[in-house]
Each structure stands twice: as structure tokens, then as C-alpha cells.
Amino acid sequence: MDQGGTGAPAHTAATYGQYAGTWFAGHSPVYAAWAAHVAATASLAALIATLPPDKRQPNLVFAATQFLGCPDADPATWEAFLRGNWPAVRTVVLGHRTQTNEPRRCATLLPVFGLIAARTRRPLALIEVGPSAGLCLLPDLYSYEYDGVTRLGTGAPLLRCTTTGTPPIPAAMPRIGSRAGVDLNPLDGTDPEMVRWLEALVWPGQDGRLATLRAALATLASPGTERPRLVAGDLNERVAELVADVPPTHTAVVFHSAVLAYLPPGQRARFAATLATLDCHWVSNENFFLDDSGATVPSAHGDRFTLALDGRPLAHTGQHGATLDWIR
């Protein structure tokens, strides 16, 4: 059953140990404990290793158990739930993707969108790679508070962010002319089952994130909101099509957050090469730095992301948008 070879359980255990110590530590004690338990329990790592390689991620497996009703329990209780419901867990994992839709990341993206808008003086045509339900395509419909001061917007949710350095927080909301995205499996943020999955992807103990998600979903579902155009397909196959659809009166901005980590290095390099041929700006917010040649440089900042514009790093950001450390 080990689809990844004899080394798959050990690799799975190591991955869960890394998540426990780097990504979950200090953010979700429940997930940190579950991941550490998998790392320390060979039979549990072996069970998870029977999943296809791209379906073994802690976020996906844990979210599947949450989706099926597992409480935020101690590791032993979680393990019993996983084993007792393994066929159902496996079905959920195989039928879903890690499509966390984190609207708080708009607080770290907005200054870069503002920079582009100020330079081009045209409405932005936002094109998100891996948009999930498209909540990050609605930045102008939210409101923002940087360092305890409300600066922009009147909509919900209110996105709070602390900063260091001198980030170029815009004085006015950038004009958004159009919104589009490409995802292997776009989600309908108004469908109750898809909403349940999005909520299951929020880590235990992060009630603020859950409230923000629900407020953003309410904005998306509002009768006055024009829904983003979300197309199904491979990002490398369809991003050029979306850029080509942008009228000359708009500035195309292709952006992504926590998406390219799920691609093999060759596909990342292909994506960078494709963007280099397109008439667009490129905003990357990932846990590694992908330069304009497609080379991947791991982040040296633990659980931080590197925010870059057109292959040039500008800031380090909190993985869920709570912090912005400007380095330029």
C-alpha cells in the first residue's frame, strides 16, 4: 500500500515533524501536537503514507478530520478518530485540496497593489493563481487597520496588520477594474458544502481567522458584489489566456500566496518563464523566494513568507497576513 516506496513513512514522519516545529508552533497548539504525534508514531505515519504523495500534507489530512467532525482533542483522541474513520478520511482527502482562502493576506498584498496602481495610474486587473473561492480578489471591498490605525476602506471584514520598516500603505484604495483567477478546482464560496470545507481548513484555536473568513464570504455573497471570474485549469496552461483578456486600459497583475509550494520545481520555473513573456506585473507571496528566472530560494525566516514584485523581494510577511516587515 506504500505508494511512495519503502521510505515514504519516514519521509511522512519527517514532514509532520517539520510542520509541528515550524508552521504550527506558536500558531495552533492542537495542530502542533497532532503533527508531533504523527512524527513520533511510526504506524500512524505509515498509514498516512498510503495516501498519494500530494495528499499527505498535514493541512489536508487534519482538515479532513475536522470536516468529518473530529473535535479539537488531544493527539490520542485524534488518532483514534483517524483510524476509526479512515475510509471516510481517505475519501475526503482524495476529493479535496488544501485550498485555504485567507482574506487577511490582502493586508500584506494591498501596499504592493497600491505601488503598481500609483506607477501605472490605471485600474488593476487582478488575476490570482490558486484563488480557491476568490476572497483575495476582493481587496477593495474590505477595510484595513495598520498598526492600530484604520487607514482604508469601510467594508467587512476589518483586516488588522502590524508592520515594521516603511511599507507604502496607500492613501486611497487602488481601483480594481476586473477580477479573475485560475485554479485546478475553483470553489463556490456561496455553496454550503464548500464553505464547510473552507472553514475546516482554518486551524484550531484561530477563532479570529474563522470570523474573518465568514465575514469575507458574506461580502462575496452580497447582492452588490460582482463575483470574480474563476476558471478551472492548470496555472501554466491558462494564465496567459487570462492576461490576454485584460483590456489595454487596465494593468494586469498576476499574484499568488502559498500556492507554488505545491508545484514541483520544474513547474515553478515554467511559471516564472511564462510570466516573463506576458504584459503583466507579478506579485509573489510564498514561503520561498522565486526569482524571475524561476530559481527557488528557501526562506530564511522560519514561518514567514517572502513578498516580491516582479522578481524583487520587498517584504517578509506573516503566513496568514497579520504582519508585514518591509525590507526595501
Language model: regions and residue ranges:
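C-terminal substrate-binding/active-site "lid" region of AdoMet-derived donor-dependent transferases
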Residues: A261-G311
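Class I SAM-dependent methyltransferase Rossmann-like catalytic core
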Residues: G21, A35-P123, L135-S143
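Short amphipathic alpha-helix with an adjacent loop that forms part of the alpha/beta core around
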Residues: R238-P247
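A short SAM/SAH-binding and catalytic strip from SAM-dependent methyltransferases
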Residues: H250-P265
